[in-house]
Amino acid sequence: MENINTLRETLNQGQKSLSKENIEDLLKDMPRHNSFRYINQGSLTDEYFRFARQTLDDLHVYIVISNTGSPAGEVISLFTKKQYNHASLSFDRNLKTIISYNGGERIYPPGLNMETVKYFNKKRDSSIMAYSIPISSEKKKAVIDTISEINKEGNAYNLIGLVLKFSFSQT
């Protein structure tokens, strides 16, 4: 009986995720979600990195795992079979420095961008978990420096690569 209930839940989730509205939204937005070149150079500003470095006395980083209920997130859930499919990183407790690889709310170019916290609960069935992880000031600085390098080098966000777990990026 438990297997039947699990199958029923999976089918219901699939029906919701693959609804006509979700598919239309994904197809319409597909060009924005599939960058095969590093197009997102410098999306994080010098001001962002100044603020991030001001947090070095806070010996934590903050990880936010979310289920925003977006069409892309719902389809990703079909493949991962996980409720939470998006991760964000912040250097401060108030999430002023929160970033992730995202296409966000019509962000272009998609890639490494600041998150817009208000969109985490845009849909009624959205949910988040936030973690505070201890880190030394030196390691936190190294993380900020690594993100700064990625930001300078450029990056791409590719939904197909995310689902297939294969990087399609080209420099």
Residue ranges and their predicted role:
Residues 1-171:
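Cysteine-nucleophile amide-bond enzymes
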